[in-house]
């Protein structure tokens, strides 16, 4: 007796990610089950389904201060008002002329004067506030004034700071570098699995952080008078960090057309 042939059957299986598979199977403890089977997507659904890769990117950038301010104080106390004024103005003119000869622009020099009576004498004091963008030039000018002027002229330690525009540029740079790092990561992932990276579908900056210097406030206030110029520049350096999350479209490898 001949055996009756079984009619051919077709089985459609879709590989399901482990997370989906575990949800569908509801695995019981101590018992193994077969991977879940799902109905295949229709050709229309397969074409419209968007494949994507989600990556995060981080960055940390820093920038030193772009401005420094130095204050030069000149004072004189005399019994005669004219003598006090003459003493201060003579040294004040010498300071401003020296600054201009060294290439300091007039808009970066601010002069204030104060004249008052002190008991039976007259006291005059003048301040020259100088803003520098070149720190090497600042040090040369300060050294020159210390050498040429007497002890009645007091030169304050430089105060370093950032202009608002430079801080905003640093924030943008941190975000852009984080986006670039995320794009490179997604590009390498797609190359590894034989796919082509598509356009970004979502770009989100999740976290930003800024901090200044590497010396804590207590230590900085205690040592501010003894810090060197380079240490002050380092403590005034601003750091910015950014973290972004990006979703990219994933395309299949494009097949090269064979030309007949």
UniProtKB/Swiss-Prot annotation:
Keyword tags: Cytoplasm, Nucleus, Phosphoprotein, Transcription, Transcription regulation
Bias (Polar residues): 41-50
Chain spans, region Disordered: 30-50
UniProt-listed InterPro entries: IRAK1BP1 (IPR030312), SIMPL/DUF541 (IPR007497)
GO cellular component: cytoplasm; nucleus
Post-translational modifications: Phosphorylation at Ser-56 and/or Ser-62 is required for full activity. Phosphorylated on at least one of Ser-235, Thr-237, Ser-242 and Thr-247 upon TNF-alpha activation, which favors nuclear translocation.
UniProt region (Required for nuclear localization (NLS)), positions on chain: 240-260
Cysteines joined through disulfide linkages: none
Domain of life: Eukaryota
Sample GO molecular function, one term: signaling adaptor activity
Residue numbers carrying Phosphoserine: 56, 62, 235, 242
Residues bearing PTM Phosphothreonine: 237, 247
Gene Ontology BP annotations: immune response; positive regulation of canonical NF-kappaB signal transduction
Location relative to the cell: Cytoplasm; Nucleus
Major localization listed first in the record, in broad terms: cytoplasm
Similarity remark: Belongs to the IRAK1BP1 family.
Summary of subunit composition and partner proteins: Interacts with IRAK1 and RELA. Interacts with HSPA8 and HSPA1.
Role: Component of the IRAK1-dependent TNFRSF1A signaling pathway that leads to NF-kappa-B activation and is required for cell survival. Acts by enhancing RELA transcriptional activity.
Domain notes: The disordered region interacts with HSPA1 and HSPA8.
Name of the protein: Interleukin-1 receptor-associated kinase 1-binding protein 1
């Amino acid at each position: 007796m001949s055996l009756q042939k079984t009619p051919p059957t077709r089985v459609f299986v879709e590989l399901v990610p482990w997370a989906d598979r575990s949800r569908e199977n509801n695995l019981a403890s101590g018992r193994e089950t077969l991977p879940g089977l799902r109905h295949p997507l229709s050709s229309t659904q397969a074409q419209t389904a968007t494949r994507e890769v989600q990556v995060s990117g981080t960055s940390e950038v820093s920038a030193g201060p772009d401005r420094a301010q130095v204050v030069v104080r000149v004072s004189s106390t005399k019994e005669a008002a004219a003598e006090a004024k003459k003493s201060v103005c003579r040294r004040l003119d010498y300071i401003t002329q020296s600054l201009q000869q060294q290439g300091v622009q007039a808009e970066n020099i601010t002069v204030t004067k104060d004249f008052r009576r002190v008991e039976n004498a007259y006291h005059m004091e003048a301040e020259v506030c100088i803003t520098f963008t070149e720190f090497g030039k600042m040090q040369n000018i300060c050294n020159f004034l210390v050498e040429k002027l007497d002890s009645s002229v007091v030169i304050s330690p430089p105060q370093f700071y950032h202009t608002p525009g430079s801080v905003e540029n640093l924030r943008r740079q941190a975000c852009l570098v984080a986006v670039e790092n995320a794009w490179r990561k997604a590009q390498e992932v797609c190359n590894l699995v034989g796919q082509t990276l598509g356009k970004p579908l979502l770009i989100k900056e999740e976290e930003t952080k800024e901090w200044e210097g590497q010396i804590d406030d207590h230590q900085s206030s205690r040592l501010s008078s003894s810090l060197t110029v380079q240490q002050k520049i380092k403590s005034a350096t601003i750091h910015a960090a950014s973290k972004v999350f990006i979703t990219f479209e994933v395309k299949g490898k494009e097949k090269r057309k064979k030309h007949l």
